[in-house]
Amino acid sequence: MSKNIIFIINIVKDERSKNQGYNYSIKSWEHYSKKINADLFVLDKPLYDFSYMKPQWYKMYILDILEVNEVKYDQVLYVDADTIIHPNAPNIFEITDNKFCAIRNFGCMDWVCRSLENYSKLLFEDFIFPYYNYFNSGVMVFNKKHKEFFKSIQEFYQEQHERIKHVQDNYHVGNDQPVLNFFVNRDIPKDYKVLDYEWNMQDLTRFEVLGEDMLHTKYGYISHYNAGVKPTPGYWLEKTYKHLYEN
């Protein structure tokens, strides 16, 4: 019997990643998976040497990983390991319309625009799309019909990984996220559904809503501790988990 899958990549690369509190993220998603009758899949082993491919790119292989492991699935929710899901969150799989779903990127707009400009010029033959269509790849929903779409990105990486690394090293722009955005906006724009910010509350520090009183947790479903939250993402992952699940 097929089920919906929640997929997390939790690869320990160094001491920093070991001590980021990602276990609290996983625990929150364990609660959610049971609530909505989904299966949780945590990838904790590298697919490639880090010198060739960073773990962020493993998102493009999720459907292949599930098939290799003989996991039957309907839809897949991918989430970054620096997220906490609210215990009152409804079933995200019921609002997707069977499309590729993501949440627009909020904040870091200079970085977004520079990523668009440089990837467009150096890797996508001047194809460009509006910056306000750019999404954060830390929360995405997709399904079986997107297998060929992800396959095309895998092939692109295999052919262009040296140029991609050059762009990242010399222009200090995004990693997998800009490439994924270009493919979605170029190849499947009509199959792309934007979900509300409450499903990926990102860049909380710059929005000045991240505080010790945890007020932000009342206004959304997924807290995403990206974009350099202080003192560390691990601090907020632990604090948020205990606030939502242990109080």
Question: Where are the predicted features?
Answer:
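A short acidic, often aromatic-flanked loop/helix-cap motif at beta-alpha or helix-coil junctions
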Residues: 46-51, 108-110, 200-205, 230-231
